[in-house]
A protein has these predicted regions:
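Sec-dependent signal peptide recognition
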Residues: 2-9
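N-terminal signal peptide c-region/cleavage motif recognized by signal peptidases
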Residues: 14-16
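N-terminal "domain-start" segment that seeds a small globular fold
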Residues: 18-44, 113
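Short active-site neighborhood of thiol/selenol oxidoreductases, capturing the structured segment around
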Residues: 45-62
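Hydrophobic beta-strand anchors of alpha/beta hydrolase catalytic cores
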Residues: 53-54, 85, 140
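Structural microenvironment flanking redox-active thiols in thiol-disulfide oxidoreductases
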Residues: 65-109, 120-125, 198
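Short, internal strand/loop/helix patches
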Residues: 102-139, 143-145
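Thiol-/selenol-based redox modules, centered on thioredoxin-like
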Residues: 139-198
Length: 198
């Protein structure tokens, strides 16, 4: 585990001159398909109307797993008020992302919120990342009730505030007070579906 983590850190710092350019905010969250260990798929838009915090993580990264536990605490406390934590694992050199691995970390860390996985291409597209851009891991994205991205980790070294529990609470408090979108507004958005993969 330590060897894999060291390799990931080395790879992340191998091209210091290149970085993920800051994406404009707020901006509408793109759609994202999340694969669940059960074989079902869930669209990110299924959570519209809630304040969503997504962590894109490497399963082999202890730091990513610590952030996942932070989101678990926030979900348990703030979930009734409209917070939805989501974790999405994706592959890295020396670190796969699949149903059995996701199931293992969910049970090991006792995570109570949705945890799934996807491929690196889908993550890059969602984050608007170019192939040569250095991606800070974990990537934490905060989406408001209307589906707008209000905060994102971005380029290395990222935004430590999005990995800190107290800072996240401060950021989330006003978002949770915002009014959820009306039913009419929701009808103008693409419908989210949950289905079994083939």
């Amino acid at each position: 585990m330590r060897k894999i983590t060291s390799v990931l850190v080395l790879l992340a710092s191998a091209i210091p001159g290149l970085a993920l350019p800051p994406a404009p905010m707020p901006r509408r969250s793109p759609e994202l398909t999340i694969y669940e260990p059960s074989g079902k798929t869930t669209l990110l838009s299924a959570f519209r109307g809630k304040v969503v915090v997504i962590e894109f993580l490497f399963i082999a990264s202890p730091h990513c797993l610590r952030v996942a536990q932070t989101l678990n605490r926030l979900e348990q406390e703030l979930g009734p008020g409209g917070l939805q934590s989501v974790a999405v694992a994706f592959p890295a050199p020396g670190s796969d992302a699949n149903g059995p691995l996701v199931t293992y970390i969910v049970h090991d860390l006792k995570l109570t919120y949705p945890v799934g996985y996807t491929d690196s291409t889908s993550v890059d597209k969602y984050l608007e990342r170019g192939r040569a851009d250095v991606l800070n891991i974990p990537q934490v994205v905060v989406i408001d009730r209307s589906g707008m991205i209000r905060a994102q980790s971005g380029a290395k070294p990222g935004d430590p505030k999005l990995e800190d529990e107290a800072s996240l609470r401060h950021l989330l408090a006003p978002l949770l007070k915002e009014t959820p979108p009306s039913d009419n507004a929701a009808k103008t958005e693409p419908l989210a579906t949950t289905r079994k993969t083939q």
